[in-house]
């Protein structure tokens, strides 16, 4: 038997013994009466007190005798002093033998790390300068039956952190910070758009036709209607129906589902912002996106320089704007324009680069394959990549000067796609033709090609004003702003295989 396996068994036996002891303590609490009281109401948060009274001296606090009521989980227990943690941070509480009853003092000795307590008393400062609550009353509110990870081993196993996020949040301040930032980012995006007259809406999660993106959907069955349905891959077609209906500026922040691979950049369930504005084009969205990203960086980091791993992304500088075609030539100087304009040569280059070439792709699709294999990972600083071929942009408006490409961009930062946007196709007849072309692609073996959506075509036939739309991946954006290496680090409960 390996040493590691033996150590794991020993740790498990030790944990089981601690759990048994804690259950005995809970049983004793039950005998006393209500083991889980719910009549305590706090009036202060730990970190708020730390901030509010940071400049008060020991003498000033003693003279003021400021009464407080706090509650939290015991994270450290040093006998006379305990450290409790609430949603804002930590504070010390002092077990004063002069002000607490003998029964209370005896009970305190039985409490464990992880227990949740209430503490009432006055604020004071220690000789070392630490703020604490000198308790006049303290109670056990919730008995913790499982021990917290100890200081030596901690919760360092990445997979366990994802599976037991509740423990991860208890013991890792970095994790708590990440998800506070995530909430802050979403709140600011919402504020940013509402201030610009966008209306927040909700569109169906269950759809009869999965549309709005090139992706493989999750399929389910509606029992009452006896019909197949799909978890949405994108809200796009419903949001554009709302623009047709007269809601000229709309947005939605919600979940999308794509039945595809899992990686450090992909989770099958993810959060997306999509917004649409009438009487605007994709260039307007580029300007809006730059402004939003600068505000978010300043809000979260206090700077427009965004550190990520060993790199720093500069949000304060104008984002690079480069077409798909030109970016291939810029980052692959051994290739020529003639190479990219010949379908046979482009197919050869795409295959050599590692793309999955089926053999029926047109020139535009092959160019995008080459871009994805040879350019995408090289786009470190923010890049708006524009003029995607119409073959891979079935919902985007063709460019007036070059109908072979569309008025579309994707935003890349750190070699990752963060946003996708375009001037929307509002020609109903052109849209119908492109849907038919997508159906042909699906029949030829492309399981990410789109379905034909007759109702959406009908909506366009009523007339949609010139419109620009965009989708921004919230998870990848939060990864950047929190310097997180994996998408699982910014999703509270990422998808995992069940434990054996």
UniProtKB/Swiss-Prot annotation:
GO cellular component terms, semicolon-separated: cytosol
Cofactor: Mg(2+)
Cofactor binding note from Swiss-Prot or TrEMBL: Binds 3 Mg(2+) ions per subunit.
Entry binding sites for Mg(2+) 2: 417
Enzyme class: ligase
Enzyme Commission designation: 6.1.1.6
Keyword field contains Ligase: yes
Pfam families: tRNA-synt_2, tRNA_anti-codon
Subcellular location: Cytoplasm
GO process terms (BP): lysyl-tRNA aminoacylation
Origin: domain of life: Bacteria
Molecular function (Gene Ontology), one example: magnesium ion binding
Residues annotated for Mg(2+) 1 binding in this entry: 410, 417
Reactions catalysed: tRNA(Lys) + L-lysine + ATP = L-lysyl-tRNA(Lys) + AMP + diphosphate
Keywords: Aminoacyl-tRNA synthetase, ATP-binding, Cytoplasm, Ligase, Magnesium, Metal-binding, Nucleotide-binding, Protein biosynthesis
Family per record: Belongs to the class-II aminoacyl-tRNA synthetase family.
Subunit annotation: Homodimer.
Protein name in the entry: Lysine--tRNA ligase
């Amino acid at each position: 038997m390996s040493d590691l396996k033996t150590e794991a068994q020993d740790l498990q036996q030790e944990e089981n013994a601690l759990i048994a002891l804690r259950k005995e303590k809970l049983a004793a609490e039950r005998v006393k009466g209500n083991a889980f009281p719910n009549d305590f109401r706090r009036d202060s948060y730990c970190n708020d007190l730390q901030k509010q009274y940071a400049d008060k001296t020991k003498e000033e606090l003693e003279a003021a005798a400021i009464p407080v009521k706090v509650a939290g989980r015991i994270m450290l227990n040093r006998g006379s002093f305990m450290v409790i943690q609430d949603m804002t941070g930590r504070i010390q509480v002092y077990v004063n033998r002069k002000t607490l009853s003998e029964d209370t003092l005896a009970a305190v000795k039985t409490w464990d790390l992880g227990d949740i307590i209430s503490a009432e008393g006055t604020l004071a400062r220690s000789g070392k300068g630490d703020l604490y609550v000198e308790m006049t009353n303290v109670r056990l509110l919730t008995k913790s039956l499982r021990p917290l990870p100890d200081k030596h081993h901690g919760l360092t196993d990445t997979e366990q952190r994802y599976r037991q996020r509740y423990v991860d949040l208890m013991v890792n301040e970095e994790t708590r910070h990440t998800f506070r930032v995530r909430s802050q980012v979403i709140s600011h995006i919402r504020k940013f758009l509402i201030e610009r007259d966008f209306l927040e809406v909700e569109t169906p999660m269950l759809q009869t036709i999965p549309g709005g993106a090139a992706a493989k959907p999750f399929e389910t069955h509606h029992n009452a209607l006896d019909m197949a349905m799909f978890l949405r891959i994108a809200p796009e077609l419903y949001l554009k129906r709302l623009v047709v209906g007269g809601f000229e500026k709309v947005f939605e922040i919600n979940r999308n589902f794509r039945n595809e691979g899992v990686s450090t950049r992909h989770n099958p369930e993810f959060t997306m912002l999509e917004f649409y504005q009438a009487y605007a084009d994709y260039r307007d969205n580029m300007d809006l996106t730059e402004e939003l990203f600068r505000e978010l960086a300043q809000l979260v980091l206090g700077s427009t320089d965004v550190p990520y791993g060993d790199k720093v992304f500069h949000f304060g500088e104008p984002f690079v704007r480069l077409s798909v075609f030109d970016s291939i030539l810029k980052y692959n100087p051994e290739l020529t324009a003639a190479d990219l304009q010949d379908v046979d040569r482009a197919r050869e280059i795409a295959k050599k680069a590692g793309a999955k070439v089926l053999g029926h792709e047109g020139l535009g699709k092959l160019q995008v394959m080459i871009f994805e294999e040879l350019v995408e990972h090289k786009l470190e600083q923010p890049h708006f990549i524009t003029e995607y071929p119409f073959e891979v942009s079935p919902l985007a408006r063709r460019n007036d000067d070059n109908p072979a490409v569309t008025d579309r961009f994707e935003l890349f930062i750190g070699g990752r796609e963060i946003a996708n946007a375009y001037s929307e196709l509002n020609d109903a007849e052109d849209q119908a033709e492109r849907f038919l072309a997508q159906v042909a692609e699906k029949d030829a073996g492309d399981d990410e090609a789109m379905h034909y959506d007759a109702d959406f075509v009908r909506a366009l036939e009523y007339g949609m004003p010139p419109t620009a739309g965009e989708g921004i991946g919230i998870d990848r954006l939060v990864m950047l702003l929190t310097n997180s290496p994996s998408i699982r680090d910014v999703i509270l409960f990422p998808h995992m295989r069940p434990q054996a």
